[in-house]
Amino acid sequence: MAHYKVEQDDWLTVYLKYLLFIFNFFFWVGGAAVMAVGVWTLVEKSGYLGVLASSTFAASAYILIFAGALVMVTGFLGFGAVIREDRGCLSAYFCLLLAIFLVELVAGVLAHVYYQRLSDELKQHLTRTLAENYRQPGAAEITASVDRLQQDFKCCGSNSSADWLQSSYILSPEAEGRRVPDSCCKTVVARCGQRAHPSNIYKVEGGCISKLEQFLADHLLLMGAVGIGVACLQICGMILTCGLHRRLQLHFY
């Protein structure tokens, strides 16, 4: 009977090792996905960050990149800990899993807080940006962000093209008679903004605010979904790590 119990204990240890090894593979892939989402958000969509009043959106993406990179490094430690059956490495692996979980939790909270105030921030800041900062000295980044926003989303003005009538740029001689910036035009050519007819410029219900709000909401949802998926994996991993650590401890004694 004692011999059977020893064999059973050995099989439990082997079973836990295989489970943890499989988990670690998916965990490593999940880390790569988290980092990829963060990098993609910053690289491909950074052109819109200049029109946001808060840096929370960018901060969430940076945290995801950091967490993803840490996950991939931790994954290698996990493979080594399982293969070597080293309790010290397993303890370090568990601590890193817990640390990554907390980092992702912070990113999730930031994303949720930002999502709650997203609409109000856009309405206040984008309208003011168009009126006060577009084509003004020292505002080249904001100007480029607004131009890209209007061209990519095929919109004009924060709520409508009429918002540009309050713009310092449009009211200045520099505008050369433009009623909207050239980036509002369906086909951008020099001084095309002088003709603000629906056949020439984008007329979108809700303006650029509605388009940008939906875009940011979709990205926050994607970041949240990826983060939650990896966090669930981590909880499973911590449970398996504790189980294997306990089995190895019993074998040691």
Swiss-Prot record:
The entry's keywords: Membrane, Transmembrane, Transmembrane helix
Protein family membership: Belongs to the tetraspanin (TM4SF) family.
Membrane-spanning segments: 19-39, 63-83, 90-110, 220-240
Any Pfam family matching the protein: Tetraspanin
Gene this protein is translated from: TSPAN11
Subcellular location: Membrane
SUPFAM superfamilies named in the record: Tetraspanin (SSF48652)
Predominant cellular place of this UniProt entry's protein: membrane
InterPro entries linked to this entry: Tetraspanin/Peripherin (IPR018499), Tetraspanin_animals (IPR000301), Tetraspanin_EC2_sf (IPR008952)
One Gene Ontology cellular component annotation held by this UniProt entry: plasma membrane
Protein name (database record): Tetraspanin-11
Membrane topology recorded in Swiss-Prot or TrEMBL: Multi-pass membrane protein
Domain of life: Eukaryota
